[in-house]
A protein has these predicted regions:
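Active-site beta->alpha N-cap acidic-glycine motif
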Residues: 51-123
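Catalytic domains of cell-wall/extracellular-matrix polysaccharide-remodeling enzymes
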Residues: 135-226, 244-265, 271
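Short, flexible loop segments at boundaries between secondary-structure elements
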Residues: 269-277
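Short, well-ordered coil/turn segments that N-cap beta-strands
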Residues: 56-59, 81-83, 104-106, 150-153, ...
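Active-site mouth loops of central-metabolism enzymes
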Residues: 58-65, 126-137, 215-220
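Terminal interaction modules at protein C-ends
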Residues: 1-57, 226
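Glycine-rich anion/phosphate-binding loops
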Residues: 90-96, 131-140
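Conserved, mostly hydrophobic/aromatic
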Residues: 64, 155, 240
Length: 277
């Protein structure tokens, strides 16, 4: 339905070259990860002095890299809370996971693979946007990826530490998102990201991740990151956290739900996006 209703503006196939394919990933192999560091996280924003704070801070939690481990994904989907689900294109369980998440009322994002600094040593996987693509190739690949995901309302980047530093490529991506009425969440895989100024230029609704919950899978680390997420939200009014489909992430998040719900309002990520000023 989404593809039929929203992709009517897709470029004509007869004028678009076939995009260069990233090397195929086995349908049984989960996605690779970029290595994140504290330097990719922005300093907390200070709320305006003359603006009254919200009654309660808001936290949006995105679980991304979904589409490969069906059983583990369903553990997150079946949690009795508010999450945002982000699925990888061309993943084997995309359709069934989106259907289950939508039935639960979760918002759905495309987890858009983009070229990392380490490419080609590290592959972003099927459906990736690559720096070598021409504008027509990139737009064709992007429409292919978007059209796979029913109930889609936004996009966040998978990897992308190279491409998110490149304003011309970002303008190509954001021009499509603007046309299709989608927002963008910057996963902040590089401290040099140019996503926010590009979103401002094209007036695309935007937000960025505040905390990676589980770039280490040590249980105590994940607990500390959840506390950081809460503290960020209290300091600036809202915060976005990104987690991944690890069993330990599910277990610690489930354990932390009472504290989260006591301290903050858990909200869908669309609640905290806005056009950058």
């Amino acid at each position: 339905y989404w593809a039929q209703q929203r992709l009517r503006t897709a470029p004509s196939p007869d004028r678009i070259a076939e995009p260069p394919a990233a090397p195929p990933r086995s349908k049984t192999v989960p996605p690779a990860y970029e290595v994140y560091s504290a330097e990719t996280e922005k300093a907390p924003k200070q709320p305006p002095a003359n603006k009254a704070p919200k009654t309660r801070p808001e936290v949006a939690i995105i679980i991304d890299d979904l589409g490969y481990d069906r059983a583990l994904a369903h553990k997150f989907i079946e949690m009795n809370t508010v999450l945002t689900i982000s699925v990888l294109p061309d993943s084997p369980f995309l359709k069934s996971l989106v259907a289950a998440a939508n039935q639960k009322g979760y918002e759905i994002l495309l987890h858009l693979p983009m070229e990392p600094d380490e490419y080609p040593r590290i592959q972003p996987g099927p459906g990736a946007l690559l720096m070598a693509m021409s504008p027509d190739e990139l737009i064709a690949q992007l429409y292919h990826d978007l059209g796979q995901v029913p109930h889609l309302i936004g996009v966040n980047n998978h990897m992308g530490s190279r491409m998110t530093k490149d304003p011309p490529k970002l303008r190509q991506v954001f021009s499509v998102l603007k046309k299709e009425g989608l927002f963008f969440i910057d996963s902040r895989t590089t401290a040099e990201t140019q996503c926010e100024p590009s979103a401002r230029l094209l007036q695309v609704p935007f937000a960025e991740s505040e905390v990676f919950i589980d770039h280490s899978t040590d249980p105590e680390f994940i607990r500390r990151q959840i506390k950081r997420l809460i503290n960020r939200a209290k300091r600036q009014g809202y915060a976005i956290g990104i987690g991944h489909p690890h069993l330990i992430t599910f277990q610690i998040l489930q354990e932390a739900l009472p504290e989260l719900e006591k301290e903050v309002d858990l909200v869908p990520v669309s609640r905290v996006v806005k056009i950058p000023s």
